[in-house]
Amino acid sequence: MSSFFDYNNKFIQIMNKAADMMITSTMWILLCLTVVCIGPASTAIYHAMAKAVRYERESAFKEFWRSFKQNFWKSLFFGLLLTVFAVSIYFVDITANYDFLFNNAAPDGWALFGLIFKVVVLAILGLYVFPVISRFNMPIPRIFVSSLLLSIRHLLSTVFMLVVLFIAGYATISYPYLVFVLPGAFAFLQTFPMEKIMRAHMTEEDRVEDESVDQWYLDIENKE
């Protein structure tokens, strides 16, 4: 019986990870309800899933709040930027496609293309910007450019993450109670392609530094 409750027991480890996903998902939801904190919360949940759940450094709760505070302003900027972009899509592109989306009318080809294109760009930026902020200390313009370049350079991984994101979104709409676990679960799955992508663009010196328990953020700004 004692071995069943051993921390190294696989079942216990899985349950601990599931609990971390539920806790961080709930924190993410509550913070996103403020709208203003969407960016900082998104950076924090990725950081917590990568550092605490996948790499098992510290606790997910502790790392979530550490990242939330440490990356607040840059994440706030991009969170508000993407929120404004999303609102513009709603009022401009959704309105232009209203009859097609809600009244079964024939679609306007260009209007529909514009809607799909903008939604995909919004999703891609969201997928890359916040993990980059969680990993690298760099100026805001470089975060934006690096996120776009990484999404293009690693197109297959980008497509994979987009598909998983839209599946998660559809599942949440269909089964709303999943909102208490899917944000964390998605962020955890996202760490597998994203960590591989970001580590591929680190120098050998960066990789050595990254192996340290206390070293996590890579200060690109001060190295140049």
Label for each model-derived stretch:
Residues 115-118:
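Cyclin-like alpha-helical protein-protein interaction core
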Residues 1-113, 124-128, 132-224:
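Helix-coil boundary and N-terminal low-complexity module in membrane systems
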